[in-house]
A protein has these predicted regions:
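Glycine-rich, anion-gripping cofactor-binding loops and their flanking helix/strand elements
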Residues: 72, 220-304, 405-436, 449-451, ...
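Thiamine diphosphate
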Residues: 40-114, 116-123, 263, 268-278, 283-287, 313-316, 396-474, ...
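Structural signature of the thiamine diphosphate
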Residues: 29-30, 72-82, 88-109, 132-184, ...
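Aromatic-enriched
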Residues: 172-199, 346, 357
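Active-site diphosphate/adenylate-binding microenvironment
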Residues: 16-19, 24, 28, 37, ...
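Phosphate/pyrophosphate-binding active-site segments
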Residues: 2-10, 145, 181-183, 206, ...
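Glycine-rich, acidic loop regions that bind phosphate or pyrophosphate groups
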Residues: 4, 109-150, 246-349
Length: 562
């Protein structure tokens, strides 16, 4: 819960001034957004802040994803702003994306004056109603006296339990109204995690100790527990698989890592899971892209499911032990009760299945191919690099091939699968981590969704490198149509050729077309080493596929492809 500590100096604020004051009190250093008439009072107050830097995005969706990039890399709530009407509706996709991926955001929008709500005033939309299904919580502030509690509650809610976005819609007259406040809310803090029973921990430990073929299944909810996750895996010798959102929780080359499961996961991993007699599921929600046909997923396995969100327990698969709690808190009590076991027979079976179902990486040494490019880029940077992706084939190729070795290194749109995520998220990551290199893997379809944010990267001279795999197509759509639809490919290829090099140069980015370089690896190293933003372009054959692939509606063992 929020701290009960208070300060007792009476102060006079406009609503807008209080908002900025409160953000400063929360330690917010960067706010991103686009101003408009209904939020100009807040921007007027923000202009006087010596603590908060404003990043002017080129589109409100870009602002939302920039905020996500900041929040995903440090786990703290980040703030985005927009005006009413189109400003608010342009934010919707980025906020919905944050909701599905459990990202703590504070979204502040202006609204028409309270007396005009419901009159179809200029740039009026029902922001409160629109945002109900896509936020963890939302507010329409009708009176200035509500602001202190609303702001404090918003920050607490965004970061407590399962994190998520909170939307605060503030009419313009509330922003300009004046009030005096004597007792200012102290810094908002996370609410305490739910308590859990010792009996459930003992039951879970007994199941792990008795299991012959256990698998540790990690989802995005383990993001704050990397040390204990690894300790559990290593002590109990648990083969460990990860969802798309959990990649990096165990280093790619760790001997217990099975890599990613599911639709485009490691072929052997999907078969190994079918042999499991116990699944220890931490912070995962049994997403359909991860488990395939539900009734055929791990049919012989008992399930221990730990998640901070009660709604996820039993929603898709019924657990034998369900624990609603913070994963790190649970592991702190569980690990001492878990026996160290070699599990030699199980590891031999895992190794046999990995040999039977290998995971080849074609053209791994060719920097002008999909996998080869990813490997070549990885060779140019150290383990501190932050990786973002857009959504499509390039996303899956990167998930399969890039050596992800640490939490919060990998930023991708998992639940909503939003094209246009990668570049603004990379900008946010670079703003929050100015000493780290940020690599954004994108495709031509995705990059065009928020290409205008190249201007934001350029203006702020951020060390963001865009690696563009250009197949002049919507690659995953092209793949699914060619594989599973009788009429073949339709509306998935672009007839015109876009000169991305000229576009990037026009925004002020350095550029490199690897197809025109005599030594692509050397050219790649040289441009990645340069400070500032850059576009690296490679042409990819539109017929390239992401394999293996679980067909829509199929079981994970019904994979197709090489």
């Amino acid at each position: 819960m929020a701290s009960s500590g208070t300060t007792s100096t009476r102060k006079r604020f406009t609503g807008a001034e209080f908002i900025v004051h409160f953000l400063e009190q929360q330690g917010i250093k960067i706010v991103t957004g686009i101003p408009g008439g209904s939020i100009l009072p807040v921007y007027d107050a923000l202009s006087q802040s010596t603590q908060i830097r404003h990043i002017l995005a080129r589109h409100e969706q870009g602002a939302g994803f920039i905020a996500q990039g900041m929040a995903r890399t440090d786990g703290k709530p980040a703030v985005c702003m927009a005006c009413s009407g189109p400003g608010a509706t342009n934010l919707v996709t980025a906020i919905a994306d944050a909701r599905l991926d459990s990202i703590p955001l504070i979204c502040i929008t202006g609204q028409v004056p309270a007396s005009m709500i419901g009159t179809d005033a200029f740039q009026e939309v029902d922001t409160y109603g629109i945002s109900i299904p896509i936020t963890k919580h939302n507010y329409l502030v009708r009176h200035i006296e509500e602001l202190p509690q609303v702001m404090s509650d918003a920050f607490r809610i965004a970061q407590s339990g399962r994190p998520g976005p909170v939307w605060i819609d503030i009419p313009k007259d509330v922003q300009t109204a004046v009030f005096e406040i004597e007792t200012q809310p102290a810094m908002a803090e996370k609410a305490a995690a739910p308590a859990f029973s010792e009996e459930s921990i003992r039951d879970a430990a007994a199941m792990i100790n008795a299991a012959k073929r256990p698998v540790l299944y990690l989802g995005g909810g383990v993001i704050n527990a990397p040390a204990r996750v690894r300790e559990l895996a290593e002590k109990a010798q648990l083969p460990t698989t990860m969802t798309l959102m959990a990649l990096g929780m165990l280093p790619k080359a760790h001997p217990l890592s099975l890599g990613m499961l599911g639709m485009h996961g490691v072929r052997s991993t999907n078969y190994i899971l079918q042999e499991a007699d116990l699944l220890i599921v931490l912070g995962a929600r049994f997403d359909d892209r991860a488990i395939g046909k539900t009734e055929q997923f791990c049919p012989n396995a008992k399930i221990i499911h730990v998640d901070i969100d009660r709604a996820e327990l039993g929603k898709i698969k019924q657990p034998h032990v369900a624990i609603q709690a913070d994963v790190d808190d649970v592991l702190a009590q569980l690990i001492p009760l878990v026996e160290a076991q070699p599990r030699a027979e199980w590891h031999q079976l895992v190794a046999d299945l990995q040999r039977e179902f290998p995971c080849p990486i074609p053209k791994a040494c060719d920097p002008l191919s999909h996998y080869g490019l990813i490997n070549a880029v990885a060779a140019c940077v150290d383990n501190n690099a932050i990786i973002t992706t857009d959504v499509g084939q390039h996303q899956m190729w990167t998930a399969q091939a890039y050596p992800l070795n640490r939490p919060r290194q990998w930023l991708t749109s998992g639940g909503l699968g939003t094209m246009g995520f990668g570049l603004p998220a990379a900008i946010g990551a670079a703003l929050a981590n100015p000493d780290r290199k940020v690599l954004c893997f994108s495709g031509d379809g995705s990059l065009m969704m928020n290409i205008q944010e190249m201007a934001t990267a350029s203006e702020n001279q951020l060390d963001v490198k865009i690696i563009l795999m250009n197949n002049e197509a919507l690659g995953l759509v092209h793949q699914q149509q060619s594989l599973f639809y009788e009429q073949g490919v339709f509306a998935a290829t672009y007839p015109g050729k876009i000169n991305f090099m000229q576009i990037a140069a026009g925004f002020g980015l350095e550029t490199c077309d690897l197809n025109n370089e005599a030594d692509p690896q050397a050219a790649l190293q040289e441009i990645i080493n340069r400070p500032g933003p850059a576009l690296i372009h490679v042409r990819i054959d539109a017929e390239e596929k992401v394999y293996p692939m679980v067909p829509p509606g199929a079981a994970n063992t019904e994979m197709v492809g090489e």
